[in-house]
């Protein structure tokens, strides 16, 4: 079983909507949006549309006027790519969400913010290899394509024994340099190269494998597979969902503050201001509990191993 970026976005959205209890109004495009500067949009129905925000794909658009006879919308001159979203084209029959409670753009941002925050507690396990040269003690951390790798710490290192035994012998003396000299290794102050220095005896020409901890990666494309892009096990997916959910719920009450609009006052008579906060705290508690469980599991799988740095 795999989970993609799109799957996680949909799971966050359906949780926030109470499965099917709350549904945003929607319609469809009756003609493709073929340009990122188009200011006239044709839809199948304008019965639920008014002046304000619509969402097509991940783009937010500000609608200035609408024609209920011709089912067309007129976008404000500044209305494409509204609120920092990216203006994009859209195919005919694409979904048009009217005043989305949680825009996909914001949901995706919350997911990646959660992944970055998790880096303080949990790490992705990665590995790289290099061929040992007895004349060289220091090696740059590079992936198979020659790009720099970024490590938090070294978990373990082994080298492949000579002969048919297929044994990988632990490297006892190895040191990580997270900010290698720019003059020697290149890179920059913002993105320095990282190196490992080996002080053990290793048979020349043998492969050395370094297992290291790294920050979880973020997601970008809808088709990105969670485990591949982040480096985390699939069991961490629900942590990301819970983290994104509590982040999004945090900002519901400020939108209903009494100084915002008369409509907010009317809503407050039915649902007290601050009611969202208690729900958010419950979800945050679940998030921290699951994160602690996953941290413990990771520590059991990769216990601290003693190695010398010199």
What are the roles of these predicted feature ranges?
Residues 38-44, 83:
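Short alpha-helix capping/helix-loop boundary micro-motifs
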Residues 1-33, 47-82, 86-310:
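Glycine-enriched, solvent-exposed interface loops adjoining structured elements
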